[in-house]
Amino acid sequence: MAQKKYLQAKLTQFLREDRIQLWKPPYTDENKKVGLALKDLAKQYSDRLECCENEVEKVIEEIRCKAIERGTGNDNYRTTGIATIEVFLPPRLKKDRKNLLETRLHITGRELRSKIAETFGLQENYIKIVINKKQLQLGKTLEEQGVAHNVKAMVLELKQSEEDARKNFQLEEEEQNEAKLKEKQIQRTKRGLEILAKRAAETVVDPEMTPYLDIANQTGRSIRIPPSERKALMLAMGYHEKGRAFLKRKEYGIALPCLLDADKYFCECCRELLDTVDNYAVLQLDIVWCYFRLEQLECLDDAEKKLNLAQKCFKNCYGENHQRLVHIKGNCGKEKVLFLRLYLLQGIRNYHSGNDVEAYEYLNKARQLFKELYIDPSKVDNLLQLGFTAQEARLGLRACDGNVDHAATHITNRREELAQIRKEEKEKKRRRLENIRFLKGMGYSTHAAQQVLHAASGNLDEALKILLSNPQMWWLNDSNPETDNRQESPSQENIDRLVYMGFDALVAEAALRVFRGNVQLAAQTLAHNGGSLPPELPLSPEDSLSPPATSPSDSAGTSSASTDEDMETEAVNEILEDIPEHEEDYLDSTLEDEEIIIAEYLSYVENRKSATKKN
């Protein structure tokens, strides 16, 4: 397959350079049949490539037929408005995986999915369509989603099956059940990530329960994230981790939608943040790797752009020649795994594009890095006997150039450093939580407490000054019923208490109405503003203060609410199961797959080189 893609790329390159239009005479006659001149062209190109003439002729004929189909489709689209979509089917299908499908663009995504399933013999409910690196939305029209004429559509199956399984009803039923489970799993993933992202955006959850909500730099310390970007970043990281979990299990068809969702949310974050951490660069590699493992790399039109972006992000994050990384960590051995994957994918992409020289350069770089990163299994065993995990052993040995003693010291030191960092981060979160609780105890809303502490960089005294200077902050929406001390009118007792403090009775009553009967807040605000209320505060909030009426349905809904909570807990726990405990899990790899693929593609390139030398 890879060799055929190389041949197609080289022949396409030759045709472009020689300005040959295969869909015109003398290569195509008036009946759109192949012309005699095509055989001469195949002979000419096979001599240039030192390839079998029949194979070259066959590929050129395929290119000619595709060109005619595309031209016919273009004419048809101009006259009728019926667009052509190039459909790439799953690898398991033995028939030609690139197929053309005609459709109007005003139909919905669901109708297109149904049409693809019917045309190519797939089960509609168990496939997903990816167009322009986005999942096709079933409820929107193709036009609304930017689907255009001649677009590429990749079909992903939610099940792993073989042809003989389709002949057996029992096996097919099992596959359908498996697909249903995977679809439910995807939906739970989305729900769980939304819950975690919401918690992260609120930044008020218990630090004991939220170690998974942090994003850290190369030292392991948490990075301060603007509230406006926090939710998007958490969703991006969550989808990325879930996608990586599927990648580890080699479930590429399910991994890809998660990775594409992660890419979408990362794009909502500022450039400065993405340059601070390597997450975004790693995601680009994972997306290209996923397309490659699905044997659909040609569907990813911007594979080169993604790989270049990853390389640029690594440079911004790690510094020129990894200098910044070495300065921070003392080594860059573990991160070299990422560069091995980068060079390998660049080599594969160049080979598929017909660029043998560039392909060999990148593949050779990957091979050299593999030799450098290869780990003697006996050294891993030595570290396992010392009580370290296999993952710690691999990472430690790569960080210490394979020296077992140095690796043991490195792992121990790293454990101690991370334990200290976690202790400091935990204490910082604990203080923040205490400050929020303190402000809530004074009558301020959770939302107001969060925002003012963020504005005051966590300083409680400064936060109190801000709140007293801007009492309208207390009016920020808060859905926590614990802080909802609403009453229609203040009690005479509370009015008298404020009058006793020296405030005017009418002003005292107005302040108590504004602050929902909270004497402490009313007194603080009046004292801070010279005995009067700030003009920006609403003085007639009765409509918003009336307590919600209690109905019999409220108590009846308790069971339903409990069920929802259980479902949320299940969704969150499923996400947490795939969040790796080790913060450098993404740097850990046995490199077994990479070793095989490097050898495979180098053999293709070296065979081409040896064939060229013989001639």
UniProtKB/Swiss-Prot annotation:
Region NEDD8-binding 1: start-end pairs: 427-474
Consequence recorded when altering residue 448 to V: No effect on NEDD8-binding
Subcellular location: Nucleus
UBA domain mapped to chain residues: 374-413, 424-470, 489-529
Cellular component, GO annotation: cytosol; Lewy body; nucleolus; nucleoplasm
Record SMART domains: UBA
Induction summary: By TNF, IFNG/IFN-gamma and IFNB1/IFN-beta.
Impact when changing residue 468 to A: Partial inhibition of NEDD8-binding
GO BP term, pick one: response to type II interferon
Residue numbers covered by motif Nuclear localization signal: 414-431
Keyword Coiled coil: yes
Keywords: Coiled coil, Nucleus, Repeat
Pfam families: UBA (PF00627), Ubiquitin_5 (PF18037)
Region (Disordered): 532-586
Entry superkingdom: Eukaryota
CDD domains in the record: UBA1_NUB1_like, UBA2_NUB1, Ubl_NUB1
Annotated tissue distribution: Widely expressed with lowest expression in the pancreas for isoform 1 and in leukocytes, liver, prostate and skeletal muscle for isoform 2.
Ranges of compositional bias, category Acidic residues: 563-586
Compositional bias annotation for Low complexity: 539-562
Coiled-coil regions listed: 36-70, 152-203
Region (NEDD8-binding 2): 550-598
Function: Specific down-regulator of the NEDD8 conjugation system. Recruits NEDD8, UBD, and their conjugates to the proteasome for degradation. Isoform 1 promotes the degradation of NEDD8 more efficiently than isoform 2.
Assembly description: Directly interacts with NEDD8 and PSMD4/S5a, a member of the regulatory subunit of the 26S proteasome. Isoform 1 binds to NEDD8 more efficiently than isoform 2. Interacts with AIPL1. The interaction with UBD via UBA domains facilitates the linking of UBD-conjugated target protein to the proteasome complex and accelerates UBD degradation and that of its conjugates.
UniProt-recorded name of the protein: NEDD8 ultimate buster 1
